[in-house]
From Swiss-Prot:
Location of the Helicase C-terminal domain: 419-579
Keyword NADP: no
Low complexity bias (residue ranges): 1-15, 73-87
Coarse class of the protein's main subcellular location: cytoplasm
Binding site for ATP: 230-237
SUPFAM superfamilies membership: P-loop containing nucleoside triphosphate hydrolases
Species of origin: Sclerotinia sclerotiorum (strain ATCC 18683 / 1980 / Ss-1) (White mold)
Function (record text): ATP-binding RNA helicase involved in translation initiation. Remodels RNA in response to ADP and ATP concentrations by facilitating disruption, but also formation of RNA duplexes.
Motif DEAD box boundaries: 352-355
Name of the protein in its database record: ATP-dependent RNA helicase ded1
Alphabetic keyword roster: ATP-binding, Cytoplasm, Helicase, Hydrolase, Initiation factor, Nucleotide-binding, Protein biosynthesis, RNA-binding
């Protein structure tokens, strides 16, 4: 039996029984130093060949590991004289060897000391990353496999390519307001962009900047705060990533506080220099993928954290380095409370889809992150807000986060792209499934995204389509993060070309080559409709949108007609008839006409137009002074008197233009999002 158990020369019969000595007791329990290697331990994992106990056999009655020297981990910086347990080397821990095998002892590329987890001054990281050395950015080696993963190949169907209408972006009107607005850039050139970033932009097959990028790059590179509104699919992500990464490549990492180094030379906390907040797990994952693409071969290490995923793997990712952090507000607050993230080095704060984050109730977390933790104040950081809509209530909130900012409005903000052909069909609820099958048979090619209002309907409709031999899948808030990521991946690569989704996928997701969006259930807010159909017609490509409309959706009929007119789309006669029937009886949230509406200045810089919210259609958000009638007007603040054409309630009472104003129905102003009782 003993012979059978003699593994790798580990003889179980020889020597005295060993006892475990805790690390803090080793070397303190007496006994002579060992004099030679034991005969029976050679070849085991704990004792390299010929050097089992470093300097000799364990004496009878000795202390086992008690006399071993201080541990020095393996690595090029470890002494080579006697392998890992040899006391001939220095007795203290060699920080350069741990976690950075490529670095020599004390070399400039070491990740030890304060430079470990937060972007130290001389960092070389695995996976072909670059490093910052002697005040210069040194790019890492090329990695063909990683390049294919990040950038794809020419005409790769899983990567978004610019479409036939991309050049038309030059015709989109741009309004930039603020003091000393810098001139736009027309090409990706140096200056202002770093050469390394330009190479990565070329790898991504981007030829010319979009309108939002033309203006945002010089604004951010000039050190200004920015509030940018641009229609969805217009390159907002590149609008903030390009200048942030370019300046990081030029200026290098920030020093980590001297007391930040923990045991074994690691910092337990991450000290990112850039923080990007977004509302959904899918959107932060998408921004993270883009940041990996443009930080390729650089010293910048992007990280992503979001709820619903394993926090342990996210912590391990941050320990390997975290310079640019993409996060959802909830998970970020959790990690701050755990003491794993410090915001004191933040140079750039980005709020993407800011209006949706506030709509989803993230305002307390955002205010805590920005104002209640150790983030530098508004004067000591750059803050950028990006979204497809920026109603006045969001602009008023932005005053707390931004300083002397430039307001950038690109195109008809909050509107839809003319690249999208919009069709509205009158379909009763009972007929929706059969009409959907007709559409799928007619427009079968390409990826089709179907939006429904409820999680149950998403699963039900997906199962129905599968039973009709259409390969479909679904995503909604009740599916686990792994299920959602798997469904999105199958949709992206075309294995399931039909995706049924709730609003969780409506905002910000950039799914390449979606050719058709179907609004099976129309939303009650026209802004949600804008973002849903914005999943197609991206980057200059064309797309089709079909909406199923019936009298249950009459709350958005006027906003829908206005939207179709703006985009030069055909307006069905039944829409105009229903709009005339309901004139003056506005329902729903009011959409554009309520607190978030066009009358609320959703795409205007409120600094230029005062706080006035009483003008326009049904008033607007913000504080526009007391209304002339003495009552509450407007959908979102102290607006003006009700519009004269809209059967407003008597002066001095709650109202906002129309019996459905204010929140949903006359006599029930708090019923936000509901249908009019009329």
């Amino acid at each position: 039996m003993a012979d059978q158990l003699n593994m790798n020369g580990l003889n179980l019969n020889g020597g005295e029984p060993r006892s475990y000595i805790p690390p803090h007791m080793r070397g303190k329990m007496g006994g002579p130093a060992p004099a030679g290697p034991p005969a029976n331990l050679n070849g085991s994992a704990w004792a390299p060949q010929g050097n089992g106990y470093a300097n000799g056999p364990r004496p009878a009655g000795g202390d086992s590991w008690a006399n071993a020297p201080d541990f020095t981990p393996r690595g090029n910086g470890a002494p080579r004289g006697g392998n890992n347990w040899n006391p001939s080397g220095p007795p203290s821990f060699n920080k350069n060897a741990y976690g950075n095998p490529a670095a020599g002892a004390g070399g400039p590329g070491s990740a030890g000391g304060a430079g470990g987890a937060g972007g130290g001054a001389g960092q070389a990281r695995g996976g072909g990353d670059g490093q910052w050395r002697d005040g210069k950015h040194i790019a890492g080696p090329a990695n063909a496999r990683l390049e294919r993963e990040l950038f794809g190949i020419a005409d790769d169907p899983t990567k978004q390519q610019t479409g036939i209408n991309f050049e038309k972006y030059d015709d989109i009107p741009v309004e930039a307001s603020g003091q000393d607005v810098p001139e736009p850039v027309l090409k990706f050139t140096n200056p202002p962009l770093d050469d390394h970033l330009i190479k990565n932009i070329e790898l991504a097959h981007y030829k010319v900047p979009t309108p939002v990028q033309k203006y945002s790059i010089p604004i951010v590179m000039g050190g200004r705060d920015l509030m940018a509104c641009a229609q969805t699919g217009s390159g907002k992500t590149g609008g903030f990533l390009f200048p942030i990464l370019s300046q990081a490549f030029q200026t290098g990492p920030s020093p980590i506080p001297a007391n930040a180094a923990g045991s074994f030379g690691r910092t337990r906390k991450a000290y990112p220099t850039s923080l990007i907040l977004a509302p959904t797990r899918e959107l932060v994952s998408q921004i993270f993928d883009e940041s990996r693409k443009f930080a390729y071969r650089s010293w910048v290490r992007p990280c992503v954290v979001y709820g619903g995923a394993d926090i342990g793997s996210q912590l391990r990712q941050m320990e390997r380095g975290c310079d640019l952090l993409v996060a959802t507000p909830g998970r970020l607050v959790d990690l701050i409370e755990r003491g794993r993230i410090s915001l004191q080095n933040i140079k750039y704060l980005v709020l993407d889809e800011a209006d949706r984050m506030l709509d989803m109730g993230f305002e307390p977390q955002i205010r805590r992150i920005v104002e209640g933790e150790d983030m530098p104040g508004v004067q000591n950081r750059q803050t950028l807000m990006f979204s497809a809509t920026f109603p006045r209530d969001i602009q008023m909130l932005a005053r707390d986060f931004l300083k002397d900012y430039v307001f950038l409005s690109v195109g008809r903000v909050g509107s839809t792209s003319e690249n999208i052909t919009q069709k509205v069909e009158y379909v009763e609820d009972i007929d929706k499934r059969s009409v959907l099958l007709d559409i799928l048979h007619t427009h079968g090619a390409g990826l089709t995204l179907i939006f429904v209002e409820t999680k149950r309907m998403a699963d039900s409709l997906s199962d129905f389509l599968i039973n009709q031999n259409f390969p479909a899948t679904s995503i909604h808030g009740d599916r686990t993060q792994r299920e959602r990521e798997r469904a999105l991946e199958m949709f992206r690569n075309g294995r399931c070309p039909i995706l049924v989704a709730t609003a969780v996928a409506a905002r910000g997701l950039d799914i390449p080559n979606v050719t058709h969006v179907v609004n099976y259930d129309l939303p009650t807010d026209i802004d949600d409709y804008v973002h849903r159909i914005g999943r197609t017609g991206r980057a200059g490509n064309t797309g089709i949108s079909t909406a199923f409309f019936n009298r249950g959706n009459r709350g958005v009929v006027r906003d829908l007609i206005e939207l179709l007119k703006e985009a030069n789309q055909e307006i069905p006669a039944f829409l105009e008839n229903i709009a005339r029937e309901g004139a003056g009886f506005g329902g729903g949230r009011g959409g554009r006409s309520g607190g978030r509406g066009r009358g609320g200045g959703a795409n205007r810089d409120f600094r230029k137009f005062g706080g006035g919210g009483g003008g326009g259609f049904n008033g607007g958000g913000g504080f526009g002074g007391p209304p002339a009638s003495g009552g509450y007007g407007g959908g979102g603040g102290f607006g003006g008197p009700p519009a004269p054409a809209s059967y407003g309630p008597p002066p001095g009472q709650y109202g906002g233009g129309g019996y459905g104003g204010g929140g949903g129905a006359y006599g029930n102003p708090s019923a936000g999002g509901g249908q009019s009782w009329w």
